[in-house]
């Protein structure tokens, strides 16, 4: 799931 991919990136920033 790409949603989890970019979502984790935003929350991990």
Curated annotation (Swiss-Prot):
InterPro entries cross-referenced by the UniProt entry: ENOD40
GO BP terms in the entry: nodulation
Keywords: Nodulation
Domain of life: Eukaryota
Its biological purpose: Modulates the action of auxin, and may function as plant growth regulator that alters phytohormone responses.
Protein name: Early nodulin-40
Gene of this entry: ENOD40
């Amino acid at each position: 799931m790409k949603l989890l991919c970019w979502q984790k990136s935003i929350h991990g920033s």
